[in-house]
Amino acid sequence: MIILIHTSKAMRPAPQGGATLTVPALRDRAEELATYLKTLSVEQFAAAMELSPELADRTHGLFADWGTEPERQSPAIDSFAGDIYSGLRACDLTPADRAYAEGRLRILSGLYGILRPEDGIQPYRLEMGYRLPDPPYANLYQFWGDAVARCLPRTGVIVDLAAVEYNRIVTRFLSRDRFVSPRFLTINPKTGEPRFVVVHAKIARGAFARWLLAARVEDPADIVDFAEIGYRYEPALSKPRQPAFVCQEFGGKGLSVRRHDLG
């Protein structure tokens, strides 16, 4: 069983040494893409990514400094700081959990295509849905083609916890029957009805991935046993290959990297 998540825009700086890094499966393509991105101006980054001048300048600097030297890299699982990674809490995974994750967890990335947890990467900013100025890089779905999907096993269940912007890079090439796509809902205290809350769902996806790894869940039938940060399986709201989990009171507020939008 493979677990899919995606990268976050927020990243942590690479620590100084100590980690044993693996090499991304599609690093040659990532180098090609990064080499192109080094040619873009601050203004082109601002236009393509809809960034403020300050953030565009920072993004330009990230690619100007980008390289593949191990001393400038950190494991992918430790490099991201968005809400999904707040739920994943990679820093608390045991060495045995991380070793298990290396064979199960895959991270979809605009720059690297697909990453294993211990793959060495540098800070960057490139979402899969960005439209870049020049072909063949203008459309990243076309740039990557089926290369990312070919990095996944040919058979077996894929637990899809990635955003649609990212999972499209694999779902269009693989049988839909292979995918299990959990949904995470929060009860509205005013109406008593379940609703989709973006930040809650992102943190829940990370917590779900963490639980699958820590509990060594191998049988897809056991997915319904997830009961972390307030969530419980809700059969009435579930569909085939789309199990629904509902929380009465969200238990992941303390995990979020955000200061708001948690209501």
From Swiss-Prot:
Q: Which GO terms describe its biological process?
A: response to hydroperoxide
Lineage: superkingdom:
Bacteria
Q: Which Pfam families match?
A: H2O2_YaaD
GO cellular component, as recorded: cytosol
InterPro entries reported in the protein's UniProt record: YaaA
Spell out the PANTHER family in the cross-references. PEROXIDE STRESS RESISTANCE PROTEIN YAAA, PEROXIDE STRESS RESPONSE PROTEIN YAAA
The record's family statement is: Belongs to the UPF0246 family.
* Name of the protein described by the UniProt record: UPF0246 protein Strop_2927
